[in-house]
Curated annotation (Swiss-Prot):
The immunoreceptor tyrosine-based inhibitor motif (ITIM) is involved in modulation of cellular responses. The phosphorylated ITIM motif can bind the SH2 domain of several SH2-containing protein phosphatases, such as PTPN6 and PTPN11. Myeloid inhibitory C-type lectin receptor that acts as a negative regulator of myeloid cell activation. Myeloid cell inhibition is required to limit proinflammatory pathways and protect against excessive inflammation. Specifically recognizes and binds various structures, such as neutrophil extracellular traps (NETs) or monosodium urate crystals. Also acts as a pattern-recognition receptor for pathogen-associated molecules, such as plasmodium hemozoin or mycobacterial micolic acid. A motif (ITIM motif) lies at residues 5-10. Residues 140-247 form the C-type lectin domain. It comes from Mus musculus. Pfam families: Lectin_C. CDD domains: CLECT_NK_receptors_like (cd03593). Homodimer; disulfide-linked. Interacts (when the ITIM motif is phosphorylated) with PTPN6 and PTPN11. GO terms for cellular component: cell surface; plasma membrane. This is C-type lectin domain family 12 member A. The chain crosses the membrane at residues 44-64.
Amino acid sequence: MSEEIVYANLKIQDPDKKEETQKSDKCGGKVSADASHSQQKTVLILILLCLLLFIGMGVLGGIFYTTLATEMIKSNQLQRAKEELQENVFLQLKHNLNSSKKIKNLSAMLQSTATQLCRELYSKEPEHKCKPCPKGSEWYKDSCYSQLNQYGTWQESVMACSARNASLLKVKNKDVLEFIKYKKLRYFWLALLPRKDRTQYPLSEKMFLSEESERSTDDIDKKYCGYIDRVNVYYTYCTDENNIICEETASKVQLESVLNGLPEDSR
């Protein structure tokens, strides 16, 4: 009898345990299902974020590439514009240089023509207004020669020419030598270096290398100075008196003075 009671109790307890076990299984399964669903959502969110990040990086990369390409195009355009500008400036400078040379050549040609015309006018009229020399002077080659109507010592002659912004006659080139021989000058002081001894020698091109007189003027009263007599050079006391002839460089012939001096029928 007691065994039946014990069996009955065990049987009663088993259904309770079974029910508890079933409840426990249901709760555990529910929790496990919820956790799995939450993990799936998290994974999906992460995947979505990664996808968005990848898309964002792609968009940024595209923007960067487009911007870089645009800037490169602008840079190339600026470089081409700079090169074109430099080339245009170079061509303009070259054109201006060529024009300047042409103008310079034309000016030189006009100057040469004006000088030739003026020489022709001067040969007919010694005091023609185109003459590039002071009034009363003689124009020969590129120099003007003025014979002063006075006598003077060598030092006085130097000072007299200096007062006219000219210099005492000096044989410094072939043109001066030709002028002296052409004029057959007599007893005119020359701008030669004073000497301590009296001498003479023929007029020649060797005189081109003579030293300038201004370099030695101390005790000039005790020295000898040179003068020209036709084709010879003589030395006498610097305190003696001789004729004076001054020399200065001729100015440029003015084209207007030549044109105004031409006859009406030749213009």
